[in-house]
Amino acid sequence: MSGNTIGKLFTITTAGESHGEALIGIVDGCPPRLALTEADLQGDLDLRKPGTSCHTSQRHEEDLVKILSGTFEGKTTGTTIALIIQNTDQRSKDYGNIKDTFRPGHADYTYDQKYGFRDYRGGGRSSARETAMRVACGGIAKKYLKQVYGIEIKGYLSQLGPIKAENFDWFEVHNNPFFCPDASKVRTLEEYMDALRKSGDSVGARINITANNMPVGLGEPIFDRLEADIAHGMMSINAVKGVEIGAGFKAITQKGTEHRDAITLSGFKSNHAGGVLGGISSGQDILVSIALKPTSSLRLPIESIDKNGEPIEVVTKGRHDPCVGIRATPIAEAMLAITIMDHVMRHRAQNSNVASITPIIPASI
């Protein structure tokens, strides 16, 4: 299996399966002398880990990350950083009934066709369990970007099923299990999820992610446009079916006079572009939104086939999230951080001595 690495100068490689012994992460390209301990990475892992509320999977993983290499005396050395997270709460017996069957909406059929062999326990490599290591690796990028460039990456749940956040307060995001910025919607979300869980069904969600205090100049103008690499990273997250940058699909109904962002010496007057112009960061906030599909693992029956092509009815057992979007915020933050970090390293390597005479325009007024 290829395709387990992302990035060019700042790269992360992950390994491990849902019910394997552990998850492994390899980070290459982190500059030296960055103060780094496990505590710097654990906070986001704790936000993502399962079993923290009745609205998520009841699999109980501590998700404790350990740094195996790449640091000395609490600082990065500039060499490869290796990370490990042990899996401790596997219940593989829950998946014995799908060993020779295909769950609709999952990667069972495609993995079987591509490799001729698959780890059916919890979805194996295709499980979102893999994203725990992305969050750990992304924590390194987040710390470097914040410490060296002042870039801060934050996300929140803007919609769960039919329920949209209408008010916004960053303080509320980490004050409820949904990462919802609207305190007035929390009770509604709880009631909706309680009813959904009892029905045995699932639902999708929308997550918004921003990167503040961005420098100008990150990204390449053609195939490695900043927004293209952001979309690549976001679409690599399990269950993500759509990505928007800035105005996104709203641009379809906007007139050009509305969509273009006026520029003054005092700042951009709007940010419909989402912080990227011509594939290169403008210095405005990066604005990203992702859509996540409903979980396919349901206790409600559905038609499928077995490995012999015989028709069957599938009912999925195990512990699953009725809405994967609830735990997706730290994952999306990590992928945005990893992408921006890679472009920071690339810009530093190629353009560190460039000095434009044009004044730097502040972000939106």
From Swiss-Prot:
Protein name (record): Chorismate synthase
Job description of the protein: This reaction introduces a second double bond into the aromatic ring system.
E.C. code: 4.2.3.5
Enzyme class: lyase
Entries under PANTHER family matching the protein: CHORISMATE SYNTHASE
Pathway info: Metabolic intermediate biosynthesis; chorismate biosynthesis; chorismate from D-erythrose 4-phosphate and phosphoenolpyruvate: step 7/7
Superkingdom of source: Bacteria
